[in-house]
Amino acid sequence: MEVKNCCMVTEFILLGIPHTEGLEMTLFVLFLPFYACTLLGNVSILVAVMSSARLHTPMYFFLGNLSVFDMGFSSVTCPKMLLYLMGLSRLISYKDCVCQLFFFHFLGSIECFLFTVMAYDRFTAICYPLRYTVIMNPRICVALAVGTWLLGCIHSSILTSLTFTLPYCGPNEVDHFFCDIPALLPLACADTSLAQRVSFTNVGLISLVCFLLILLSYTRITISILSIRTTEGRRRAFSTCSAHLIAILCAYGPIITVYLQPTPNPMLGTVVQILMNLVGPMLNPLIYTLRNKEVKTALKTILHRTGHVPES
């Protein structure tokens, strides 16, 4: 397809959430507490994991990584969205748009990889308890964590480079509340079929491989739990995995809805991505703290030390 002979775009206009004209301040008041709770909840988990010696285990090491991810993931899109909901500028520079897309997919793919690693950690702990500390030693844990970040960087670099090597020389109105591939590609003044195919394949392949590995881990875990003779033993083993399973279900629904539909629905995609960017990162701390006695105990200890909660 021939590139149009026009001036190159230097900035984009984010049109925001469709069909919400006149509701900006209402949405701001609604979304701001979600974002604040996301930051507060994940900081709390991170502080609990770092300050409690009992939580210096592989499981909580990866949970701490997930908390860092959740804070970063929300912060990629939410501050700009909240600013224009307040009535400030909807403009975003070309470079900022590139950065927003890169970090959105960088941190988004890390979630898939990290959930896969966390499933493997639970599989090792339940299926090979006597060898757990040997298999999941500190060096392996660090290597797995670094690996998730490196793979996320590679994945995001591919998608970002394919999206922004295309020329943008026509309309600059992004029909979305942040810079993402489905909203940007229609603005390109060149053939986008390669970028569409690669992004669909890349996201689909990563999601499928991670999901299958998680499914394999939890199939083995379920078999092992059912073989435990005592009811209390089965209950304790299941309680360590149930929070992780809930978080996985919350993560994979939006991925399928937004990126893996043959004919995406823009309105549905926007609603789902708001839930993914705001609600998902806020729910993870709640899921893990409400169902985990060790995290709750660590948080209570911190509050006791700071004098916010009296000793019982």
From Swiss-Prot:
<keyword id="KW-0716">Sensory transduction</keyword>
<dbReference type="InterPro" id="IPR017452">
    <property type="entry name" value="GPCR_Rhodpsn_7TM"/>
</dbReference>
<dbReference type="Pfam" id="PF13853">
    <property type="entry name" value="7tm_4"/>
</dbReference>
<dbReference type="InterPro" id="IPR000276">
    <property type="entry name" value="GPCR_Rhodpsn"/>
</dbReference>
<feature type="transmembrane region" description="Helical; Name=6">
    <location>
        <begin position="240"/>
        <end position="260"/>
    </location>
</feature>
<feature type="topological domain" description="Extracellular">
    <location>
        <begin position="1"/>
        <end position="26"/>
    </location>
</feature>
<feature type="topological domain" description="Cytoplasmic">
    <location>
        <begin position="288"/>
        <end position="312"/>
    </location>
</feature>
<keyword id="KW-0812">Transmembrane</keyword>
<dbReference type="GO" id="GO:0050911">
    <property type="term" value="P:detection of chemical stimulus involved in sensory perception of smell"/>
</dbReference>
<feature type="topological domain" description="Cytoplasmic">
    <location>
        <begin position="48"/>
        <end position="57"/>
    </location>
</feature>
<keyword id="KW-0472">Membrane</keyword>
<keyword id="KW-1003">Cell membrane</keyword>
<keyword id="KW-1015">Disulfide bond</keyword>
<feature type="disulfide bond">
    <location>
        <begin position="97"/>
        <end position="179"/>
    </location>
</feature>
<feature type="transmembrane region" description="Helical; Name=1">
    <location>
        <begin position="27"/>
        <end position="47"/>
    </location>
</feature>
<feature type="transmembrane region" description="Helical; Name=3">
    <location>
        <begin position="98"/>
        <end position="118"/>
    </location>
</feature>
<feature type="topological domain" description="Extracellular">
    <location>
        <begin position="161"/>
        <end position="197"/>
    </location>
</feature>
<feature type="topological domain" description="Extracellular">
    <location>
        <begin position="261"/>
        <end position="266"/>
    </location>
</feature>
<keyword id="KW-0807">Transducer</keyword>
<feature type="topological domain" description="Cytoplasmic">
    <location>
        <begin position="219"/>
        <end position="239"/>
    </location>
</feature>
<keyword id="KW-1133">Transmembrane helix</keyword>
<feature type="topological domain" description="Cytoplasmic">
    <location>
        <begin position="119"/>
        <end position="139"/>
    </location>
</feature>
<feature type="transmembrane region" description="Helical; Name=7">
    <location>
        <begin position="267"/>
        <end position="287"/>
    </location>
</feature>
<dbReference type="InterPro" id="IPR000725">
    <property type="entry name" value="Olfact_rcpt"/>
</dbReference>
<keyword id="KW-0297">G-protein coupled receptor</keyword>
<keyword id="KW-0552">Olfaction</keyword>
<dbReference type="GO" id="GO:0004930">
    <property type="term" value="F:G protein-coupled receptor activity"/>
</dbReference>
<feature type="topological domain" description="Extracellular">
    <location>
        <begin position="79"/>
        <end position="97"/>
    </location>
</feature>
<comment type="similarity">
    <text>Belongs to the G-protein coupled receptor 1 family.</text>
</comment>
<dbReference type="GO" id="GO:0004984">
    <property type="term" value="F:olfactory receptor activity"/>
</dbReference>
<feature type="transmembrane region" description="Helical; Name=4">
    <location>
        <begin position="140"/>
        <end position="160"/>
    </location>
</feature>
<protein>
    <recommendedName>
        <fullName>Olfactory receptor 10D3</fullName>
    </recommendedName>
</protein>
<keyword id="KW-0675">Receptor</keyword>
<dbReference type="GO" id="GO:0005886">
    <property type="term" value="C:plasma membrane"/>
</dbReference>
<comment type="function">
    <text>Odorant receptor.</text>
</comment>
<feature type="transmembrane region" description="Helical; Name=5">
    <location>
        <begin position="198"/>
        <end position="218"/>
    </location>
</feature>
<feature type="transmembrane region" description="Helical; Name=2">
    <location>
        <begin position="58"/>
        <end position="78"/>
    </location>
</feature>
